[in-house]
Amino acid sequence: MRVGMRCYGQNDRSEFHCVGGEMIKYEIIDLHKIAIIGKEGLCTKEKNVVQDLWQQANSNFSDIADLGMKNADGSFVGFWGAMSDETLSFLPWTDDFSRGLYLAGVEVYEDTEVPDGWVKWVIPARKYLVTKITPESYGETFRNVINSLIPKLGMKLAGAVCDFTEPATGQNKLFFPVE
């Protein structure tokens, strides 16, 4: 078994900002490229397939469990809800962030072979604004970061947003590619 560890780059800063009445704690990090194997689908305003994709991935997880990158303690490094535009260029979703590709999956090594019925994405190394979320705060935090915090910091969204769950802690985070 190969053991992996996510190595974040240097933190530029970790700060709090009040945006839209919500206190948002965030940090800016550099993250190496990320490989994910999961179930892929197209989301639109008319049909959000995110929950269906997670259901498919979870129901068939035994197919890929041995492929997932693990920490030294045997826990998985992380589960990603990765997003991309329809060209798979990892640009932001279109149609007011309602249309794009979504991949529900587990982080793997880049050279991992993809089993039949699964898809692998390799997201390029980037700078991210990262903030912790809860299921209840997801929508409001997403909108506040996109519409207020990123512009307030003099930055711009540079790609599709991804959500991340760290199984060891149960912590959920949003990763906003910025420049």
What residue spans do the PLM features occupy?
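A solvent-exposed interaction/effector surface
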Residues: G4, Y8-E179
